[in-house]
Curated annotation (Swiss-Prot):
GO MF term (any one): toxin activity
Residues bearing the modification Leucine amide: 143
GO process annotations (BP): defense response to bacterium; defense response to fungus; killing of cells of another organism
Protein name: Maximins 3/H5
Pfam families registered for this protein in UniProt: Bombinin
GO (cellular component) term, any one: extracellular region
Amino acid sequence: MNFKYIFAVSFLIASAYARSVQNDEQSLSQRDVLEEESLREIRGIGGKILSGLKTALKGAAKELASTYLHRKRTAEEHEEMKRLEAVMRDLDSLDYPEEASERETRGFNQDEIANLFTKKEKRILGPVLGLVSDTLDDVLGILG
């Protein structure tokens, strides 16, 4: 009788352990699915934010270009206009990166490609940072 009792208790413990392991695996797989869904949502939100920023930058650059277009420009303003046009081309190339990279990298070696992208980053960041600093100066001047 003791043998039957020990066997029954052992069987109950083993089945309870198996059920708890199975439940743990199911909850882990459910957590993985939820984490994957949240990562997709985060990526989607990040993509929308980047798209919005890109659109805003394009709009700001177009607005600046139109203000400089209809009046006489100094040499400095002409250079700034050229930089803004380059920024617009670079922003447009972000919409179609495959075509832009094919156009730009045809016939270049790796060092020239690296230099080209470094120059492109400087061309984008220079005018954008200038606009941001001018805007902040204006805002601080109004507040101060």
